[in-house]
């Protein structure tokens, strides 16, 4: 059985049609670059290293997946940076935010366990079990945990989006982008950010509620007060 031939797309033949096509392509490129431009403008000089980030009460570590119940290598790098900042006295409390939507998947508890193994007291760690994406984590840090200022910790390809969204959510933020091996996961993460930037811009404009908001929690305030 012969397959029917599908018509091939044809380029405009007239000069006016070609001009409109070029204009449409240029407009698409400009619109595609707007979210990334917005992120760069918002973050400005707010990206630092573990050595020069300002002293801040709270560090926020975003989840990045578990392997057999343990933090993935990328998440472990983030947690190592948080532990380093705590040991050096640059942060006082670590807020770990991640996915706990299933009984068999608990990012925050795995992050807590890793941090305690690396010298951060459990009393200095606060868990957010509903950080399902970056925007949710930022909004919940502000509205649920009362965080007004924070150091955000993530990989370099994600940190600008995290800082931009937390700034929009009302959390004055500095970002520490940890080093990562340029493997397939790194390249995937970088490519994913191209599309995630568009969603981030929409989140910043429309400010949707997180998937789960819930009542106010005093974990961060209690941890800071107990230290004094």
Label every PLM stretch briefly.
Residues 13-22, 183, 187, 191-194:
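Structural motif marking the loop-to-transmembrane transition
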Residues 102-107, 174, 196-203, 219-225:
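A general structural signal for short secondary-structure boundary/capping elements
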Residues 190-212:
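A transmembrane-helix-recognition feature enriched in membrane-embedded lipid enzymes
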